[in-house]
A protein has these predicted regions:
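PRY/SPRY (B30.2) beta-sandwich protein-interaction domains
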Residues: 1-167
Length: 167
């Protein structure tokens, strides 16, 4: 299950999101307040994309992740966003790239990966219950991998990230 606006069309077991021409955010529905969590987002098509995490109470009608203080996003230009403020962060990304999101609620940090290359810790001092999220200006397609599909629904995954048990 997911939380979104009508700007998105959902398919493939709620793992593929196609966004229309409207602003909006789509969020996973299982929030995390402790532990270490990881997902990958395949960037299939579009422009002006953003991936990240948001408090489970954040509004899906916001223009983008990080528009308010309850979200933390990594924009396709390489900037990071929170509280409606942008700053330099990592490499830009484009169609065909896979963006990993490592949410460490024990340390209160979120780190982003581009094609399995860490961009460094983007944000710290996170507290509360967070969900994974994507969104943009419209017209983009995303595929999410929460570990269910090592082939990434036919798209190549960055893989290589494992927990302490090697999984």
């Amino acid at each position: 299950p997911i939380a979104t606006t009508s700007a998105f069309t959902i398919a493939e077991g709620s793992l593929k999101a196609t966004q229309s021409a409207n602003h909006g955010i789509i969020k996973s529905t299982i929030s995390q307040s402790t532990g270490k969590w990881y997902c990958e987002i395949g960037i299939i098509s579009g422009s002006s994309r953003m991936v990240g995490v948001a408090l489970d109470t954040s509004l899906v009608t916001q223009n983008y992740i990080g528009h308010a203080a309850d979200g933390y996003g990594y924009y396709s230009s390489g900037q990071k966003y929170s509280n409606n403020s942008a700053s330099s962060y990592g490499a830009s990304y484009a169609n065909g790239d896979v963006i990993g999101i490592a949410l460490d609620m024990d340390a209160g940090t979120v780190t982003f990966y581009k094609n399995n290359s860490s961009q460094g810790a983007a944000f710290s001092s996170l507290s509360g219950s967070f969900v994974f999220a994507v969104g943009d200006d419209g017209g983009s397609v995303y595929v999410a991998n929460f570990g269910q599909d090592s082939s990434f629904a036919g798209n190549e995954t960055a893989q290589g990230n494992a927990d302490g048990n090697g999984i």
